[in-house]
A protein has these predicted regions:
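Carbohydrate-active catalytic/glycan-binding domains of CAZyme proteins
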Residues: 1-313, 350-352, 394-396
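Lectin-like carbohydrate-binding module/patch detector with strong preference for beta-trefoil
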Residues: 308-463
Length: 463
């Protein structure tokens, strides 16, 4: 099960048995290959039971440059064996499902506070050290309201002791660090890095002649240096982790940022399995202890964190199949079919659907030509997805948010499988698809678009 996630860019020659790559190392990268799986699917985990008798599975999954994450799956027992998946779709995990039935009332919230102004008595739980830290060489109290890192000798960033990190959060995010480098001594360097193998960084280096801005990309082994007249800068990393790329930039006022260097490639590697991490660092390249760097703040912005608008509840939408760009259409023969984009059918009310909220992620889709609610009949074969005048339990779908570009899937609660088409045959929609491929081009992934006009007044239908 890949949940529709491709294997991204991959480092082939950095693994557990390989040394830590030094500057100038050659990295052998491989790009995405359609629906090739590799080690992306759910793997390595276990199962747990709840007091009410439900079972759930947890497992790892490699989400491109975000790294290895944890997935939760409903578990079904059959013939004495546990299967990830629902009774009607063993072996496949829905991307969205009702949460485990636990006694506690838990409101939705972010698991971590990622931004830190370093004003508290301790580091926030989201932070992790890249190496065992030297306790006497970092402080939150020497300069109240700042994280102070004293520089220790290191030949390069990957060996720096007091580097503090947190996971880069996807699908996209921006990390901004406010660095006061006044306390750096010659040979010191401090800044913000994308911790990976290869890594990339942007920061301030103190030379015998003064301060310079230094940008480095280990993949290309390219360095960019610019003289600085100030010792305080804002450093920024903007990452698109679905596409394995990032951009580094800097600012002297915290408002106007200037990109430095080109686009950074963020591959996944099997040395740490962690993908890309944001890191604050300070070390000395001359083989001695040096000065200090003060990080005044660290802020993470997640423009896609609010998913509430990704399910168009109460809205009228069109649905387009991601595989072949055909428009989902309830045809006059009473079945869900496809219409060519721009055609009379695609522009008509039979290709408009009102999304009704039925709670817990469930929706009912009302066809705006007055023919009824999309309902799965029979066993969900081709032409078994039909508009019926009366809504029933067989009209319920679990909306699957695919996180990007208004992509979604519809899981029938009757068959516990997805609606879809075979893009090569032109057959009507069915509700017997087990899931999608990593490239999402198998006919099960849809793209919704809100429409401004309903074309005809919605009719009162029996429920």
């Amino acid at each position: 099960e890949t949940l529709g996630t491709q294997r991204g860019w991959w480092v082939q020659n950095v693994g557990l048995d390989r040394p830590v790559p030094e500057p100038g190392a050659t990295f052998q990268l491989e790009g995405p290959r359609g629906s090739y799986l590799g080690a992306v699917p759910l793997h390595q985990g276990g199962i747990v039971d709840l007091p009410n008798g439900d079972w759930w599975g947890f497992s790892m999954m490699d989400f491109r440059s975000v790294g290895r994450t944890t997935a939760l799956s409903p578990v079904t027992w059959k013939d004495g064996w546990p299967y990830f998946g629902l009774p009607g779709n063993l072996g496949r995990t829905p991307r969205t499902w009702t949460k485990p039935a636990v006694a506690a009332e838990v409101a939705p919230r972010a698991p971590y506070q990622r931004s830190d102004d370093f004003s508290g008595p301790a580091l926030l739980p989201v932070w992790q050290w890249n190496h065992n830290p030297v306790e006497s060489k970092w402080s939150l109290t020497e300069k109240p309201g700042a994280l102070r890192l004293h520089t220790l000798p290191a030949s390069q960033f990957l060996w720096a002791r007091n580097s503090i990190t947190q996971r880069a959060i996807g699908p996209v995010s921006t990390a901004t660090a406010d660095l006061d480098a006044t306390g750096l001594q010659p040979g010191d360097t401090a800044g913000l890095a994308l911790l990976n193998m290869p890594f990339a960084s942007i920061g301030i280096m103190r030379t015998d002649a003064g301060f310079i801005l230094r940008w480095y990309d280990q993949l290309s082994n390219e360095t960019i240096e610019k003289p600085l007249s100030l010792s305080r800068v804002f450093l920024r990393a903007t990452g698109d982790y679905d596409n394995d790329v990032a951009q580094l930039s800097y600012s002297t006022d915290g408002k106007n940022f200037t990109d430095v260097g080109g686009e950074i490639r963020l591959p996944y590697q099997l040395k740490t399995f962690q993908g890309t991490r944001y890191a604050l660092f300070a070390f000395n390249t001359r083989g001695r202890e040096g000065g200090r760097a003060d990080f005044e703040s660290f802020r993470v912005d997640e423009p896609m964190a609010d998913r509430s608008q990704n399910v168009p509840l109460g809205k009228v939408v069109t649905l387009t199949n991601f595989a072949n760009d055909s428009v989902v259409w309830a045809n006059p023969h009473g079945m869900l079919h496809s219409a060519q984009r721009g055609s009379e059918e695609a522009e008509g009310p039979g290709a408009r659907f009102r999304v009704h909220d039925r709670g817990q992620g469930r929706v009912a889709l009302e066809v705006m030509d007055g023919s009824g609610y999309l309902t799965v009949v029979g066993v969900g074969l081709s032409a078994d997805v039909r508009p019926l005048n009366q809504e029933s339990a067989d009209s319920l779908f679990m909306w699957q948010d695919m996180l990007r570009d208004r992509q979604c899937m519809l899981l029938s609660l009757k068959t516990q499988r997805f609606i879809g088409i075979d893009p090569a045959t032109g057959a009507p929609y069915s509700a017997d698809w087990v899931g999608t491929h990593p490239d999402r081009k198998d006919g099960t992934v849809l793209v919704w678009q809100e429409t401004e006009s309903e074309l005809v007044p919605p009719q009162v239908l029996l429920r």
